[in-house]
Amino acid sequence: EKLAELGVARFQPVDTARGAWRRAAGRRERWERLAVAALRQSRRAHLMEVADPLPLERAVRELPAGCARWLADAGGQAVGGAPAGGGVPGAGLVGPSGGLEEAERAAALAAGFLPVRLADARLRTETAALAWAAWWALGSA
């Protein structure tokens, strides 16, 4: 819901070693209803797409060329100010509770994701996703 209010165009759940969306029966339908409610609330012109879960390695490979890629990573460079979005599509990858496995992190880095630290504190998955979306929205405004 909050991601849609911030203008996120697509929510792509990913299956990882520490967090499997396949166990979340019924979640997609709920998220779609929340996206519709957020569209009405925010008066945005486009409905956020809620995609079917994909394995992380496939999800990062299937991003369009030219898409800016950011990995929420406690060891990454601290974000400062707004990103230089300027209308370029962006993808934020937020890991599950406990973080990504090293092989998953390596796959994201190999796919061009840049590690960024969204806060000094360790954030929960939902909070990190909101922090990334708000940060990206600043650069797209």
Residue ranges, per PLM feature:
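Residue-level recognition of oxygen-bearing side chains
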Residues: 55, 99, 128
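A short, structure-level motif marking secondary-structure boundaries and short turns
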Residues: 20-21, 88-91, 139
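Active-site/ligand-binding-proximal alpha/beta "capping" segment
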Residues: 66-109, 113-118
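Hydrophobic side chains within alpha-helical segments
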Residues: 4-5, 76, 107, 129
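Secondary-structure boundary/capping motif
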Residues: 20-23, 100, 124-125
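RNA substrate-binding interface of SAM-dependent RNA methyltransferases
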Residues: 1-70
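A short acidic, often aromatic-flanked loop/helix-cap motif at beta-alpha or helix-coil junctions
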Residues: 54-60, 76-79, 123-124
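Structured adenosyl-cofactor binding patch, chiefly the S-adenosyl-L-methionine
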Residues: 102-141
